[in-house]
Amino acid sequence: EDNAPKRRIYANGKYSGWFDIRSGVAQGCPLSPLLFLLVAQGLYIAIQQEGVRGIMMGSIEVIISQFADDTTLALRSWRQLKKANIALQRWCDATGMKENVKKREGLAMGRYRHGRMPEGVKWVKEGEHAVSLGCPIGNDMDTAAWWAQKILEVRKKSNRWSNLVGKGFFGRNLIVQSMYFGRMRYWLYSMVMEKYQVKEVQKDATRLWWSRDPMDETRRHRRPVAERTARGPRAEGGLNEMDWDAHTRAFRAQWVTRYCRPEKSKWKEIWDEALLHDDDGKREMEGRGIFFCPLTAKERKMIMGRVPAGMRYVKECLKDHFTMDIRMNVKVLTAVGSES
């Protein structure tokens, strides 16, 4: 603390006075996250050195998932918890980091679901879910029920937007895109929204766009522009109105495009294990490139049939990739998937 780093703010052409940073990380500093990578890597090494064993997914062992200071451990059994605690404490002692014990929670899976678990962890109750990076994780997770609650929360907030009254489409669209669709987009990367729920979201958005009184859910409204025309690009006379169904499918389809890129990642290895091996364990000669080859309906069905029952989201990603014909039109995927 005697030599605390100092910062000052540059705003409106002027500098503020210098001030000390005595805790935390300097926000907005491009070097800060890079430096923190060195600290986070130390935890990964400590876990490895302690011999902590993770969960096997085929031949792939998953032990730890890290994103900045958010860490999730996938332990093979409750016996691994002691080793993990030793590694964690050694890392804290070496780096000066400190775990927020109040936020520690655990999810018992498999044969451990109904057994007695060690103390010191807030274990998720049966029927509930844990949260990792904002995403719910649970046994027999009811994603439809989770989405229903999320849509209800967003709808209640949107029904208070009295400032929409009197605004035109483009003014309303800025708010609908950022404050309505924007409150749900993040989870499209990891959770399947059911078809009927997709229609609910689209119906709500249409009301917010076109109704004279957007807060009145019972009031009927009439479109001044045909739906098909409104969804076209503005350069061609459209309004760029969001097609939420295409949007959700594009989010899933782009995972296959990312999967085929050369960058290495643990999740790609897990997909390899599930998708690129036949019943005899033989690997596809084309590798990931098979997803951009002309495949027959039978071949597509065969690949999708390899996806384990617990990986429904992956199966939906493949389905959307195939039905949107990404092999022929990657530009369409990029346009739909990135619209905001």
Label the model's feature ranges.
Residues 2, 13-15, 84, 98-129:
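Short, conserved micro-motifs composed of acidic
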Residues 3-20, 150-158, 214-227:
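Active-site-adjacent bridging/hinge elements
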Residues 9, 28, 32, 40-43, ...:
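Mobile genetic element proteins and their domesticated derivatives, centered on retroelements
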Residues 24, 64-94, 110-111, 141-143:
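Catalytic palm subdomain of template-directed nucleic-acid polymerases
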Residues 197, 201, 217-340:
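Extended C-terminal regions of large enzymes
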